[in-house]
């Protein structure tokens, strides 16, 4: 007499695929969260760097204007 199978092979394969799919969804969610977090952090960093570069360029331009004014006035 052969023992009866409680779960068929098809059901076990289906369960394993469902667990694998669930793990993939969880991993994709975690990766997506950290990607969005890094993008927002990068945006604020880029904005800060852009403001600093703009300020430095304005200061350099004003410095050059003052040098030209002094040169024209003979100082």
Curated annotation (Swiss-Prot):
Pfam families the record matches: Class_IIIsignal
Entry's free-text remark on domains: Contains an amino terminal motif QXSXEXXXL, which is part of a class III signal sequence.
Keywords: Fimbrium, Secreted
Broad class of where this protein is predominantly found: secreted
Motif (QXSXEXXXL): 12-20
GO cellular component, one term: cell surface
Pro-sequence residue ranges: 1-11
Record-linked InterPro entries: Class3_signal_pept_motif, ClassIII_w_PIP
Compartment(s) where it occurs, according to its Swiss-Prot or TrEMBL record: Secreted; Cell surface; Fimbrium
PTM comment text: The N-terminus is cleaved by the prepilin peptidase EppA, which recognizes the class III signal sequence.
The name this protein goes by in its record: Probable pilin MJ1469
């Amino acid at each position: 007499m052969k023992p009866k199978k409680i779960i068929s092979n098809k059901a076990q394969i289906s369960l394993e695929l469902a667990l694998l799919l669930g793990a993939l969804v969880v991993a994709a969610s975690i990766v997506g969260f950290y990607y969005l977090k890094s993008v927002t952090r990068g945006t604020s960093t880029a904005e800060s760097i852009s403001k600093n570069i703009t300020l430095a360029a304005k200061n350099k331009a004003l410095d050059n204007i003052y040098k030209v004014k002094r040169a024209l006035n003979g100082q």
